[in-house]
Amino acid sequence: MAIGLPRCMANPSPPLLIKKNNHTLMEITLEQLLKSRDQRWDTERRLLQEFPGQTLVVLTVVMPGRVKRNAHTRVIARAAEAAVQAFLGPKVVLRYTNDAPTGYEAYWIVRAEARSVKRQMCGIEDFHPLGRLFDLDVIQSDATPLSRTDVGFAPRRCLLCDQEARWCMRNHTHTQEEILQRIDEMVREFNAEN
């Protein structure tokens, strides 16, 4: 057993595989999720060091629960990438993607002012049909992330009601099933129109 770690973290249980609609879905563990966040932070730091003075955009897909990769997340990730690429276009210095079991990630190093980029990304989150399912972080060259409120946008709203999303998450206002059902509806509507 690793020193200083609780037994459950030193010997994590293997991921649970689930069959649904003839697809095998992998549930991730809390340890995997936490490790992926650390790895994402390391990737962000490394990219900013390799490209000093540039802005970093990081995409992750909003997907509650222990299954982070499925048919819906692939549709959401492709739509987000296309929207971001369309906005950033020739300003992109580097694009890097990571389709990990813990969720899809994409990174763009951009030659543009961070606040302007953050406003564009907030516009995508607010106005793209699937934008509520995109998490588009903009990180300044000094590794400081910009929030929506930093650039004059309101905090993100809940998928199901008009409350601030953070408030509903913190208070467990909606069940995971309700949220996943709304995501399913959004992706089906998007697919029907595209």
Predicted regions and their residues:
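Long, contiguous binding/interaction regions
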Residues: 18-85, 99, 119-194
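Short glycine/threonine-rich loop-to-helix capping motif typified by GTGT followed
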Residues: 71, 108-111
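Non-transmembrane, aqueous-exposed alpha-helical and coiled segments at domain scale
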Residues: 84-94, 103-107
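Helix N-cap motif at beta-to-alpha junctions
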Residues: 111-117
